[in-house]
Amino acid sequence: MDASWHQSDQVLDRLREKALELGFTAIGVTDPDVSQHVSFLEHWLESGFHGSMEWFERHLDLRRDPTQLVPGTQRVISVRLDYLPENTDCIDILNDPDMAYISRYALGRDYHKLMRKRLKHLGDWFSDEIAPHGFRVFSDSAPLLEKHLAEKAGLGWIGKHTLLLSRSAGSWFFLGELLTDCPLPVSDEHEKSRCGSCTACLDICPTNAFPAPYQLDATKCISYLTIEHKGPIPEALRAPMGNRVFGCDDCQLVCPWNRYAAIGDPAFHPRHALDRQPLCELFGWTEAEFLMKTEGSPLRRAGYVKFLENLAIGLGNSHSDTERVIQTLRSKLGQHGPTLDEHILWAIAALQRRASENALDNASAHQSNHAHQQAPDAGQI
C-alpha cells in the first residue's frame, strides 16, 4: 500500500460513509491541539463557574493535551449523533406549570453506551478495512474539550450559549470522539460563527446563568441545579426554575438555528410518556417505579431522591389544586432526607402564599364589582 494512503481524501470519504451507515450524522477529523482554549478553561474554573463539578479541576493536564490522555494520538475523529425527538409539544409543556418539563435529550435512551458502541464499530472497521491503527473511543467519559475539538473538526461553531451549533442540526445532538495514532488528513471545512448580533439564548435564560456571551455560570444553570448540584437548591433560583425538573432547553428552544434541525435517532424518542407527565404523577412514583421507568435513561444520573427534590420545587411553582398538591407533597415528608424536606416545606409555603394572594385578589375584585353595582347612576344625582 502506498505510504501516503492515509493522506488521501478517499480515506475520509470512506470513513464518512461508514459513519453515516452506523447512524452518525456528521464526522470530522482534526489534530489534538487545544492549547488556544486552555486559558479560557482556567479562567472559568478560577471564577468558580463549575460549582461542585470538581472533576473539571482534576486531570487539567489531560484537558490541556489529549496526547497525554492517549499517548501517540495524532488525530481526533469527532462525530455527531442527532437526538431531537418528534412531536414532544415541548413549548406547551414548558408553559403548563402543572406538567413536568424534562430536557429533550433525556426523554429517551441514555446516549453514552450507544455512542461508545457505534464508535467502537467505526474504529474496528477502520482497523480491519483501512489499516491496523490504534484507537480509543470516548463519549463524555474523559477529560476532553470535546466541543472545541468538534469545532476544529468542522462540525460547527460554539454559540453564545456555549453549545456547539450546526447549520443542519442546530444544537440538538451529542458528540463523541475516537482518538487514533493514524495521521489522517484533517477536515478542511470549518464553520464560522453565524450567531451575529442575536442574543436570544442569553436573554431567555430563567436564572441569568450567562454572565457574558460564551460564558456559562453553571451554579445558576438549571441543568446543573437539577442534575449535578448536591444539597438544597438556592432559594432565589427555585421560582425561576418553574416546572423544569431535569435539565433545561430554553437557550436551545429560542435559537433560530434549531428551526432547521431534523428528527434524531429513534433511540432517543420519548419513553414512558416522559414528555407529557404531570408533576404530581411523577412525584407519586415509588423508588421501584422510578428504577423501572428510567432503566437505560439519563434520569438515572440524578437518582430517585434528587428527582423528588426537583419535582418538589416544580410542585411549589404549580397552579393546580393547592390542597391536593400539598397533600401529595406531605406524603414524602420525613422519608428521604433533609434536602427533600426543605424543598417540600418551601413548596408548601409557596403554594399557601399564592393561594392567599389569589384569595385577596378575588375578594378585592368582588368588592370593587359590588361597589360599582351599588354606585348611583349619574343621572340620579
Identify the role of each PLM range:
Residues E189-H190, S197-A200, F210-P213, R300:
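Flavin-dependent oxidoreductase catalytic cores
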Residues F290-A302:
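Acidic, Ser/Thr- and Gly/Pro-rich intrinsically disordered linkers and low-complexity segments
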Residues L308-S320, D341-L351:
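Structural detector for internal amphipathic alpha-helices that build alpha-solenoid repeat scaffolds
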Residues I222-G242, L253-E289:
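A beta-strand-loop signature enriched in Asp, Gly, Thr, and Trp
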Residues R301-K306, H336-T339:
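Alpha-helix N-cap/helix-start positions at coil->helix boundaries
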Residues E21-F24, A200-Y224, R244-F268:
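Iron-sulfur cluster-binding cysteine motifs and their immediate structural context
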Residues M1-R194, I233, G242, H370-H372, ...:
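Auxiliary alpha/beta "docking" domains used to position bulky ligands
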Residues L291-M292, S320-L333, R354-A365:
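Amphipathic alpha-helical scaffolding segments comprising HEAT/armadillo-like alpha-solenoid repeats
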